[in-house]
Amino acid sequence: MSKFIINPSNSMYGNLKIPGDKSISHRSIMLGSLANGVTKISGFLEGKDVLSTLKGFQNMGVKIERNSDNVIIYGVGLNGLKKSLVPLNFGNSGTSIRLISGILAAQTFDSELYGDESLSKRPMGRVINPLVQMGALIESNDGKLPIKIKGGQTLKGINYDLPVASAQVKSCILLAGLYAQGETCIKESILTRDHTERMLKGLGYRLDTNKNKICLTGGAQLNAANIQVPSDISSAAFFIVAASIAPQADITLIGVNVNPTRTGIIDILKLMGANLSLSNECVIGGELLANIRIQSAQLKGIRIPKDLVPLAIDEFPAIFIAASCAKGETILTNAKELRVKESDRIQVMADGLSILGIENEVFEDGIKIKGGVFSKPSSTIKSHHDHRISMSFAIASLRCHYAIEIEDVDNVQTSFPNFVELANQIGMNISLVSA
């Protein structure tokens, strides 16, 4: 196990290129494997979560070559996967296991899927239930991992109203729909990230989208293409918040994914008074990219709008740090989903903020944070093996006059392997220490 020791710093300057988007990297491996022909990927994220997806498809017979952040996939088509000789281990990656379940539900062979201790606590019923409605046969551990998927089932298209705002559930059903007889339609009451839909279209698959409804008909094919993965806004979020709260800061993040279904972090921080701007906007591979410049600002507390919650669901740990440095109170509700991430992010962040002297009140579906001044930490902060918790409390050092220690930070490797390197490059002072 490793820990962060972060010494105080109060300024950030420079330009950064953030690693590739995790969501898009996952999907590029999955859909590239199912496409006909050779898919070339650049900007691929080399984090542990995405490598779990890559390894899973290699175990199912797909030839994949990797050279740093460049990947070549020799697609096998929708029906070319082979039974893995070993159970498929997806480590800590909820995206991998939920999306791949939709693909495996339609295969001719049986599959067994499992993950690490953290992933084994997360709910799988939200994808199992619609897949069973489509005709899948799935055994689970009371709605959790491990799961066994029976091969040889004929799937049928369904009309499905998403009970929770989840791009993972939506994507799982769409991927199963590629194999299903007839039309599969999904209706979402609140907009969620749409990378799966964009990539399916980019690989030549027809989707019909009408406001909050997405439909596709099974039986068509995916055609290989070159995919450029933009920088991940969820990883960029730590530096966006860091520069916003630092006493002195002026940084620019290059080529960040600003897909409108992912920019809740930007919208929320602007409501709080952040000084940030976008430039050099362009569309590459169906995704919107831009440079983001962030300068120091005096933030104010807000009530976070309900419609922005799913558009910033992965960024809330960092937003909680921003709220801690804001003038007044910030209130978040309608975010119960945060309790079933890699950790209970509402409670774990609340506990850490209390260690730093920040008043907060926890709700079942959110939190109220009273902005203040970080005090001398009363103890070491526990990350609960959650990468976003570790990185969020690391950036708190920009407003803390004392060293902060964070336990169990190994999982930062799942999404942002060079976080410490980039943070120190622009003025932070983080040491990674083996415990």
UniProtKB/Swiss-Prot annotation:
The keyword Zinc-finger does not apply. One of its GO terms (biological process) is amino acid biosynthetic process. It catalyses: 3-phosphoshikimate + phosphoenolpyruvate = 5-O-(1-carboxyvinyl)-3-phosphoshikimate + phosphate. The active site is at 314 (proton acceptor). GO terms for cellular component: cytoplasm. It is an enzyme of class 2 (transferase). Coiled coil: none annotated. 3-phosphoshikimate binds at residues 22-23, 27, 166, 168, 314, 341. Its main location: cytoplasm. Keywords: Amino-acid biosynthesis, Aromatic amino acid biosynthesis, Cytoplasm, Transferase. SUPFAM superfamilies: EPT/RTPC-like. Signal peptide: none annotated. Its EC number is 2.5.1.19. NCBIfam families: aroA. Monomer. Belongs to the EPSP synthase family. HAMAP family: EPSP_synth. This is 3-phosphoshikimate 1-carboxyvinyltransferase. It comes from Vesicomyosocius okutanii subsp. Calyptogena okutanii (strain HA).
